[in-house]
Amino acid sequence: MSVEKALKDLVKTGVYAMGFKQSLKAVKAGEAKAIVIAENTPPELRRKLEYYAKLAGIPIIVYRGTRMDMGLVMGRRHGVSVLAVIDEGSSRILEQAEEA
């Protein structure tokens, strides 16, 4: 399954926190099971997320596309740099982390 298909399924059936602040909050609270990050996420945000994800033992899935592409896949009209997967629903997005 591709990351794009998994993201679409996550939006329909899962629970997630969207955006840098909400995703970081979910990681710090121990709610996040994985982080999905767009390829062109600003380096300073990416470093901070990678640091906290590593401390929490949470995998990071890199979406091979821009923030705008990721937002469009999720049905948004704006870019999405980061999202935290709280409950994958039927998306099987966590398998993407295992393959990475």
Swiss-Prot record:
Keyword Nucleotide-binding: no
InterPro entries per record: Ribosomal_eL30, Ribosomal_eL30-like, Ribosomal_eL30-like_sf, Ribosomal_eL30_CS, Ribosomal_eL8/eL30/eS12/Gad45
A Pfam family of this chain: Ribosomal_L7Ae
GO cellular component, one term: cytosolic large ribosomal subunit
Molecular-function GO term, any one: structural constituent of ribosome
GO biological process: translation
Keyword terms of this UniProt record: Ribonucleoprotein, Ribosomal protein
Family: Belongs to the eukaryotic ribosomal protein eL30 family.
Name assigned to this protein: Large ribosomal subunit protein eL30
Natural source organism: Aeropyrum pernix (strain ATCC 700893 / DSM 11879 / JCM 9820 / NBRC 100138 / K1)
Lineage, broadest ranks: Archaea, Thermoproteota, Thermoprotei, Desulfurococcales, Desulfurococcaceae
